[in-house]
């Protein structure tokens, strides 16, 4: 059984026990439980994508860690003028462990 969930404007395919890296959830601390909105549930041959059915289904997950991703270098360069700008960015992520995917009602 797996589900497609939405977190931080992105979609992730998750199953029970998976550890997934999502954009930082700033309101939660390590060890807290969060609920993620479900877009699709696949249970064997049964596929549930009806928004009316999935409205009540929330995937539960536990916060494992808050960390930063790899450094990304942003370089701007204009030819023949000597204009150069360098900037770096490290995205903040939250690692979550999926603890439960409720079965969709038929």
Curated annotation (Swiss-Prot):
Write down the PANTHER family for this protein, in alphabetical order.
50S RIBOSOMAL PROTEIN L21, LARGE RIBOSOMAL SUBUNIT PROTEIN BL21M
Keyword presence, RNA-binding: yes
Q: What is this protein called?
A: Large ribosomal subunit protein bL21
State a GO cellular component annotated for this protein.
ribonucleoprotein complex
BP term (GO), one: translation
Q: What organism, scientifically named, is this protein from?
A: Streptomyces griseus subsp. griseus (strain JCM 4626 / CBS 651.72 / NBRC 13350 / KCC S-0626 / ISP 5235)
What PROSITE patterns has UniProt attached to this entry? RIBOSOMAL_L21
Q: How does it assemble?
A: Part of the 50S ribosomal subunit. Contacts protein L20.
Query: Keywords for this entry?
Result: Ribonucleoprotein, Ribosomal protein, RNA-binding, rRNA-binding
Its Gene Ontology molecular function terms? rRNA binding; structural constituent of ribosome
Q: Does the keyword tRNA-binding apply?
A: no
Q: Which family does it belong to?
A: Belongs to the bacterial ribosomal protein bL21 family.
Q: Which residues are in coiled coils?
A: none
Function as written in the Swiss-Prot or TrEMBL entry: This protein binds to 23S rRNA in the presence of protein L20.
Q: Which HAMAP family match?
A: Ribosomal_bL21 (MF_01363)
